[in-house]
Amino acid sequence: MIDRHHTVTFTGHRTYCGEADEALRQAIVRLVQQGYTTFLSGMALGFDLAAAEQVLQLRREGVLLRLVAVIPFRGQERSYSDEERARYCRVVAEADEVITLAEQFHRGAYQVRNDYLVSHASYLVAWYNGSKGGTQYTFLKGLKCGLALENLATFQLLDQRLFQ
């Protein structure tokens, strides 16, 4: 069972290419020091997988934390390249828990996953650059639901109308 008060979730763009890996690592270490023990990844390419890999690396180094892979539907990785699929499967194999929300793809599968992430955490670490899509949805939902938010994106010119 996930204790949301000690749980962090991640959201970020699929275009993430490691730009904030060190800041991400530092954020995870700091959050563990603050008492967060469980980290949720939605397992999408880009920031989600990078965040999951950081959690796993820290766990290998002896940091006491858990990774929960939250998969929107069985077979999510089928459309990935061979290299991306291998990376995804390594993370799933090393995760402390795997939660699959649906047996097959359906319209809204990613939104259901994003809602799950927000409703099971109290802290959200994002790589959000202000563009529309699932990351924006999750970021704004986290804001609306009162999660503590940390945005690692260097893009600082977020449209303030998003927060009104």
Model-predicted regions and their roles:
Residues 1-164:
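Acidic/glycine-enriched connector segments
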